Regions:
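Conserved activation segment of eukaryotic-like protein kinases, specifically the C-terminal portion
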Residues: 31-40
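Conserved catalytic-loop aspartate of Hanks-type protein kinases
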Residues: 54
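Structural helix C-cap motif within protein kinase domains
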Residues: 67-70
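Short proline-rich PxxP-based motifs
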Residues: 84-95
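Conserved C-terminal C-lobe helix
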Residues: 96-109
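Terminal C-lobe "cap" of eukaryotic-type protein kinase domains
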Residues: 110-132
Length: 133
């Protein structure tokens, strides 16, 4: 995605191009929706975006970086919406990655935002703590 930047030392940084909004907590709702359909969480399609919607986008971004392809690449926006709302969440291939990383992505891509971990909880997940993929 256009908002991922890689430094000369290989560090990946996320940018928001000034589109971010500050919310009080992870249950706060956004008043407007802006985003790319390939990264939109189920609740975004139902106009209920929240901070946990970004956790979904993180999971999709990790799959894209790890497998060098977005799981929704080549699909029209309407088909992506149907996939996100009605089909199982995408997953990271377990053949090339640790079970911790596969599990981390799975936690990011829980369909129900109320059940999805928030960023603070994700920081406690094994792969983040051990830094081993």
């Amino acid at each position: 995605p256009d908002n991922l930047f890689i430094s000369e030392s290989g560090v990946i940084k996320l940018g928001d191009f000034g589109l971010a909004v500050q919310l009080e907590h992870s249950c706060s709702k956004r008043n407007n929706v802006c985003g790319t359909s390939m990264y939109m969480a189920p609740e975004v399609y139902e106009e209920e975006a929240c901070l946990k919607s970004d956790v979904w986008a993180l999971g999709i971004s990790i799959i894209e970086m790890a497998e060098n392809k977005n799981p929704f690449a080549g699909m029209a926006s309407v088909k992506i919406m149907n996939q996100v709302l009605n089909k199982p969440s995408p997953s990271l291939s377990s053949s090339g990655w640790s079970s911790d990383l596969v599990g981390f992505v799975k936690k990011c891509l829980v369909k129900d935002a109320n059940e999805r971990l928030c960023v603070n909880d994700l920081l406690e997940v094994g792969v983040v703590v051990t830094n081993e993929c």
